[in-house]
Swiss-Prot record:
Tagged with keyword Repeat: no
Molecular functions (GO terms): ATP binding; proline-tRNA ligase activity
InterPro entries: aa-tRNA-synt_IIb, aa-tRNA-synth_II, aa-tRNA-synth_II/BPL/LPL, Anticodon-bd, Anticodon-bd_dom_sf, Pro-tRNA-ligase_IIa_arc-type, Pro-tRNA_ligase_II_C, Pro-tRNA_synth_II
Name of the gene: proS
Principal location listed in the UniProt entry: cytoplasm
The keyword Hydrolase appears for this protein: no
Keywords: Aminoacyl-tRNA synthetase, ATP-binding, Cytoplasm, Ligase, Nucleotide-binding, Protein biosynthesis
Protein name: Proline--tRNA ligase
Assembly and interaction partners: Homodimer.
Family designation: Belongs to the class-II aminoacyl-tRNA synthetase family. ProS type 3 subfamily.
Length: 492
């Protein structure tokens, strides 16, 4: 129950871990670093998937599916990409097991079943996809290709946390091929904007759009655009990335096309993705010491109706009203559950739905039947009011928008209050220690300074904001000339 959660102010990390498990979102599995996403958690992910999938298709993208395994020679074809992911790769070396002759009932890897070439379990799919695109692209008429894949990937993480960092996770990865550099850059920007729109309109999570520094870019990319969000503990979270790959992968896999003019050129590429890490972002942006707080646009259950009764006769009367409400709410697009399960008492249900972040709860008892009212409770504000039965549906419709907007405004206010401009390294360290959040500071543009600041403070450059204040200044660490401010933060 919510009351058993560790308070955020006492131990934010412990609060998060407890909430994920107690709200029935996910749990650890028998495989170290891998999670089980439980039905309620998966229902939220499905809502995310559905909205993103719609947005992708509305911008001309199609879904496809590519193999989980990547032959090692393909994986290493694009050198920077291979080097960047090498230490995180799981590798298949054999293709069967056999009975262990020394241990009856046990199995062993068959030493005679060694693969001729090792297979990398995909940490990302550029290699297998670009090897495929080579067969799909001959002419400018075959372009652009705009494909998305919903899949699982494996990156062998040692220190894992549910949703935020797991060895296996679910994600979508888009891979596009274009005839021109400008078209590929437009695609990179478009997808980053789509991620920002999704984060703000559906997750009610304000984000900063920007580009990564060279050392923070995706391995093999010429540019990485990103959206960065701020969690309630003052740490940043990278919520989505979109990469301009130039012609690197086309050159690595020799993907060329015949131009309109009759020449032969390498195609231009992008890739972009978000993952179940968004679940962690959603949880940490809005939730409180009582449990999960979900924006209505992503809540699997937007309204729950709980009957309060002492007899079967009362339950029958309440059920009649509740079932009418269910029909009326569903007719206007509201997701609603009537919880008439008699295995648990109303008090337990109230606490459970509060813990699981259901935006609105309706309680109907015998007195409500007499008065023609229902009790309506908001999860975000924990306030209650009585509403006339005839006005409930319109009230709920209005509240869906009001709650969504209110959660965004609250998160945006917190974010804005935690963007601090500093001009000295002493102030930088002080703000980082005492306040956290984003620190807007001048940087001299060198990876050496970037790394030194990271070593000294554990803060990284989250992004160079697209809307940053241009203007010369002095680097916060070295005093060398700076072209403009960037955003630093400690991050997940």
């Amino acid at each position: 129950m919510g009351k058993n959660l560790t308070k955020r102010s006492e131990d934010y990390s412990k609060w998060y871990n407890e909430l994920v498990v107690k709200a029935d979102l996910a749990e650890n599995s028998a495989v170290r670093g891998c999670m089980v996403i439980k039905p309620y958690g998966y229902a939220i992910w499905e809502k995310m998937q559905a909205e993103l999938d719609r947005m992708f298709k509305e911008t001309g993208h199609q879904n496809a599916y590519f193999p989980l395994f990547v032959p090692k020679h393909l994986f290493e074809a694009e050198e920077k990409n291979a080097e960047g992911f090498a230490k995180e790769c799981a590798v298949v070396t054999h293709y069967r097991l056999k009975n262990d002759p020394d241990k009856p009932g046990k199995l062993m890897v068959d030493p005679d079943a060694k693969l001729e070439e090792e297979l990398v379990v995909r940490p990302t799919s550029e290699a297998i996809i670009w090897n495929t695109y080579k067969n799909w692209i001959q002419s400018y008429r075959d372009l652009p290709i705009k494909v998305n894949q919903w899949a699982n990937v494996v990156r062998w993480e040692m220190r894992t946390r549910l949703f935020l960092r797991t060895a296996e996770f679910l994600w979508q990865e888009g891979h596009t091929a274009h005839a021109t550099k400008d078209e590929a850059l437009e695609e990179t920007e478009l997808m980053n904007n789509i991620y920002a729109e999704f984060a703000e309109n559906f997750m009610a999570m304000p984000v900063v759009k920007g580009s990564k520094t060279e050392s923070e870019r995706f391995a093999g990319a010429l540019e990485t655009y990103c959206i960065e969000a701020l969690m309630q503990d003052g740490k940043a979270l990278q919520a989505g990335t979109s990469h301009f790959l130039g012609q690197n992968f086309a050159e690595a896999f020799d993907v060329k096309f015949a131009t309109k003019e009759g020449g032969l050129e390498h195609v231009w590429a992008t890739s972009w993705g978000v993952s179940t890490r968004l679940m962690g972002a959603l949880i940490m942006t809005h939730s409180d010491d009582n449990g999960l707080v979900l924006p209505p646009n992503l809540a699997p259950i937007q309204v729950v109706i709980v009957p309060i009764y002492r007899s079967e006769e009362q339950l029958d009367q309440i059920s009649e009203v509740a079932n009418e409400l269910v029909k009326e709410l569903r007719a206007v697009g509201v997701s609603v559950k009537f919880d008439n399960n008699d295995n648990q008492k109303p008090g337990w249900k109230f606490a459970q739905y509060e813990l699981q972040g259901v935006p609105l709860r309706l309680a109907i008892g015998p007195k409500d039947l007499e008065k023609g009212t229902v009790e309506l409770a908001r999860r975000d504000t924990l306030t209650k009011e009585f509403v006339n039965r005839s006005e409930v549906v319109e009230k709920i419709k209005a509240l869906m928008t009001e709650i969504q907007d209110s959660l965004f405004d609250k998160a945006k206010q917190y974010r804005n209050e935690h963007i601090t401009e500093v001009d000295s390294f002493d102030d930088f360290k002080k703000v980082l220690k005492e306040k956290g959040g984003f620190i807007s500071a001048h940087w001299d543009g060198t990876p050496e300074t970037e790394n030194k600041i990271k070593d000294l403070t554990k803060a990284t450059i989250r992004c160079v904001p697209f809307d940053r204040k241009e203007g010369a200044g002095e680097c916060v660490l070295t005093g060398n000339p700076s072209e403009g401010r960037v955003l630093f933060a400690k991050a997940y």
